[in-house]
Amino acid sequence: MEDESYQLFKTDICGFCARVQQFMTLRSINIELRDIVNDELARQELLKGGGKAVVPCLRIKNGDSVDWLYESMDIIRYLDERFSTSRA
């Protein structure tokens, strides 16, 4: 997991984004947040990389590869699996 880095693309008015952020807070998971409403560069990056400007979206960079994970519950499951092993 050392080579992985994460960014959560979100908006302040998105309930599904809030769900992911609440989970991150409860688990003390610190990931860079990118607001696609207030940051046009973030919106463009999400659109170019992920193929759609839909939030929430977790950008997962692992070495040279980048994956884009949409859907709040999928993001929560992924974070739960990734960070529960490192917290054991």
Predicted segments with their positions:
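Structural micro-motif
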Residues: 49-59
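Short, charge-rich, low-complexity interaction segments located
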Residues: 43-48
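Amphipathic alpha-helical interface surfaces
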Residues: 16, 20, 42, 54, ...
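Thiol-based oxidoreductase modules, predominantly thioredoxin-like and allied folds used
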Residues: 29-42
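Residue-level detector of conserved, well-ordered beta-strand and adjacent loop positions
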Residues: 9, 59, 70
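Non-catalytic, surface beta->alpha helical segment in thiol-disulfide oxidoreductase systems
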Residues: 62-87
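Local sequence-structure signature of Cys/Sec-based thiol-disulfide redox active-site neighborhoods
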Residues: 1-31
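Structured beta->alpha junctions
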Residues: 12, 35-38, 64
